[in-house]
A protein has these predicted regions:
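Short, charged juxtamembrane terminal tails flanking transmembrane helices
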Residues: 237-241
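Bacterial N-terminal signal peptides
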Residues: 12-21
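A short, hydrophobic C-terminal helix/tail in secreted or cell-surface proteins
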Residues: 215-235
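Extracellular mucin-like PTS domains
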Residues: 203-211
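A domain-level signal for the mature, folded cores of soluble proteins
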Residues: 30-200
């Protein structure tokens, strides 16, 4: 009897904990190269949508791994890497582009003049990059360009705010800036992160994976909560016996 009572209490408390978010560890903020990312490592791009290097001299193979632009910045200081393992960034080529996607967060406006999006671009050459953002991967909004090296953009300046959520970022090298030949032609992208981060996608888009809205419990959560409440009821019933 005692064992069953303890089990019931455990299930009940587990259900309550899930319902109210008790015991859920929030994302830990990180500061990278002087930039504060309140959502921590969740702030950075998660998936590659497309990569189209261009130019008179397309970047050499070690500089054409687009997956190196995902996740937090990890540039190791080697601008002249000779193999994929040592290259921690991707070169776009002169006029080339890359489209990246958030899956566990989104980019949103802060409601003020604070910077919302940060692009980590590396290399000794100044290479400007046009930046576009999209909610669905189809309709794009231009939000200016970053002027070489690392730079931040305030998307509120372009009419967006805290109720706008973007899941795609497109970076396009400005062919009129920087070298047009060499082994790492075009902007060299290490990472892209949302300083002002919002919830993950809640609807199905052209390439995004649908997830449950943050305010709605998923089926597994509902079952766990139900089990907890049943356990509580059984415990009370046995106490009456």
């Amino acid at each position: 009897m005692a064992g069953k009572s303890v089990a019931g209490v455990f299930l009940y408390l587990t259900g309550i904990a899930v319902l109210f978010g008790i015991g859920v560890t929030p994302a830990s903020a990180v500061i990278i190269r002087g930039i504060d990312f309140p959502a921590g490592n969740l702030s950075f791009m998660d998936e590659l949508v497309s990569y189209s290097p261009k130019g008179v001299g397309i970047p050499t193979a070690p500089h054409r791994d687009p997956f190196t632009s995902l996740g937090p910045p990890d540039f190791n200081g080697d601008n002249n890497c000779t193999d994929n393992l040592s290259c921690t960034f991707v070169s776009l080529g002169s006029g080339g582009s890359i489209i990246l996607q958030f899956t566990d967060n989104s980019l949103t406006g802060s409601g003020d003049s604070a910077r919302d999006l940060h692009v980590f671009e590396i290399g000794p050459d100044i290479e400007d990059t046009f930046v576009d953002i999209s909610k669905d991967g189809v309709d794009w909004f231009a939000i200016g360009k970053v002027l070489g090296s690392t730079a931040s953009i305030d998307i509120d300046r372009f009419g967006f705010g805290p109720t706008d959520f973007f899941y795609f970022v497109r970076l396009t090298d400005d062919p009129n800036e920087g070298d047009i030949t060499g082994i790492q032609v075009g902007a060299d992208i290490d990472a892209v992160g949302a300083i002002t981060s919002g919830p993950p996608p809640t609807i199905t888009t052209t390439t995004a994976t649908s997830t449950a809205p943050p305010s709605v419990a998923e089926p597994a959560t509902i079952l766990l909560l139900g089990a907890g409440l049943v356990g509580c009821a059984l415990t009370k019933a046995r106490r009456r016996e």
